[in-house]
Curated annotation (Swiss-Prot):
Protein name as catalogued: Putative F-box protein At4g22180
Organism of this sequence: Arabidopsis thaliana (Mouse-ear cress)
InterPro entries listed in its UniProt record: F-box-like_dom_sf, F-box_BR-signaling, F-box_dom, KIB1-4_b-propeller
Gene3D superfamilies: 1.20.1280.50
Pfam families named among the record's database cross-references: Beta-prop_KIB1-4 (PF03478), F-box (PF00646)
Domain of life: Eukaryota
Signal sequence coordinates: none
Ranges of residues in domain F-box: 18-64
């Protein structure tokens, strides 16, 4: 019989412990890594070379982090907050002069979709500083011709039935996806009332998706684009991006609202208004619409209404969602995640941040509980209101934090 060693004996502490830890079986290491949060995952993989190798077989438990961007032209660093580590913030430095002058419009994993003041577009990895430059925005293929005017405004000309139609447009909803290993990507923009465009790895221009005018909000998940309009038609469509050319696979209707502070809801004098509506795709593929409700007088977000509008390939009559169960909504990403209280992700909650617009709505960063109908502040940040308004939740992928 093998002799048992006391793990606290001086001899074991002196000689056996380091070798034993470094020689743990791969299946055991994998089981350990799969139970670690992102921050602890990064710490564990640096224990020794064998642990670092073992970490490549695992994916850390994901929990949303918050990123606060620098004020315009102030510095080239940003602040990261991990809700799991109460009071702990990280500073990411040396992101480049251009970073401080750019605006983040979307996130995917550790990647940020950025635009500079001249609307040059690029994707940046927050941790590795890898960068992917995107085609010039004016390089369009389709019926709509795009010409730059100033800053984030563009002029479009639509040629239809021998006639020209001119519009002044602005970039609205943006989404993207990127593969961590191959760097394959797709970036999608909504061009105001004109159309939706996309660009994939290897493209030299932007491709227009026909009949996608009046974009209000989009979500990209599992190679599908969920698209909604803001006109009286309130169209809701799903496009399959797994093919070379995107194909529409569903069409329905979802009422989307935005910037309706002066609109009464219910009886005269009702103190609240819907400031915005977002689409959210659940873990199982259902689609929710989430109304953000603000107090008219103070313009502070007070609560949310959640409705299920699509399930199992069919349009549903609005069904109010009273509980998300063990899922949490990440409103910035338009998705839900399975919650795990051991790493700090709260189920039946909505994680949300600023409006990311120039509206005068007060921007806060909170977690809203559907069970208690109360807001919980995430953290007291030492920053300006402008920084809070541009803050975003993101899901860090498994790269090392320095």
């Amino acid at each position: 019989m093998e002799k048992w060693h006391n793990p606290s004996s001086p001899k074991r502490l002196r000689g056996d412990t380091p070798n034993s830890w470094s020689e743990l079986p791969l299946d055991l290491l994998t089981a350990v890594f799969e139970r670690l949060s992102y921050a602890n995952f990064q710490r564990a993989k640096s224990v020794c070379s064998s642990w670092h190798s073992g970490s490549r077989q695992s994916v850390p438990i994901q929990i949303p982090w918050l990123i606060l961007f620098p004020e315009y032209d102030n510095n080239n660093s940003c602040t990261l907050f991990n809700p799991e580590e109460k009071g702990q913030v990280y500073k990411m430095k040396d992101l480049g002069v251009e970073f401080s002058k750019s605006v983040c419009t979307a996130t995917y994993g550790s990647w940020l979709l950025m635009r500079d003041p001249l609307y040059n577009l690029y994707i940046l990895n927050l941790f590795t500083h890898e960068r992917v430059n995107l085609p010039p925005f004016e390089s369009q293929l389709g019926m709509v011709k795009i010409e730059r005017t100033i800053y984030d405004w563009f002029h479009s000309t639509l040629h239809y039935n021998g006639k020209e139609y001119h519009k002044r447009i602005r970039i609205l909803s943006t989404v993207f996806w990127i593969d961590e290993k191959t760097k394959d990507y797709v970036v999608i923009w909504g061009l105001g009332s004109s159309c939706v465009v996309y660009s994939k790895k290897g493209d030299k221009c932007w491709n227009q998706i026909p009949e996608t005018s009046n974009c209000h909000h989009m979500v990209y998940k599992d190679h599908k684009l969920y698209f909604s309009t803001s006109t009286y038609k309130y169209e809701f469509r799903i496009f399959d991006f797994s093919r070379e050319i995107p194909q529409q696979i569903f069409q329905g209707y979802v009422i989307m609202q935005g910037l309706t502070l002066n609109r009464h809801r219910g009886q005269p004098g009702y103190p609240f208004a819907t400031i915005d509506t977002k689409l959210v795709v659940t873990v199982t593929g259902d689609v929710l619409k989430v109304d953000r409700i603000v107090e008219k007088e103070t313009r502070i977000c007070r609560f949310f209404y959640v409705y299920k509008v699509y399930s199992s390939g069919s349009y549903k009559k609005y069904e109010k969602v009273e509980s998300l169960g063990d899922e949490a909504i990440l409103l910035d990403l338009g998705i839900t995640m399975l919650a795990n209280d051991t790493v700090g992700l709260l189920g039946n909650s909505i994680y949300f941040s600023g409006t990311h617009t120039k509206s005068k709505v007060i921007n806060d960063t909170f977690i809203f509980s559907l069970e208690t109908q109360k807001m919980d502040p995430v953290h007291k940040f030492d920053c300006s209101s402008a920084q809070l308004s541009s803050a975003r939740w993101f899901l860090p992928s498994s790269h090392k934090l320095d």
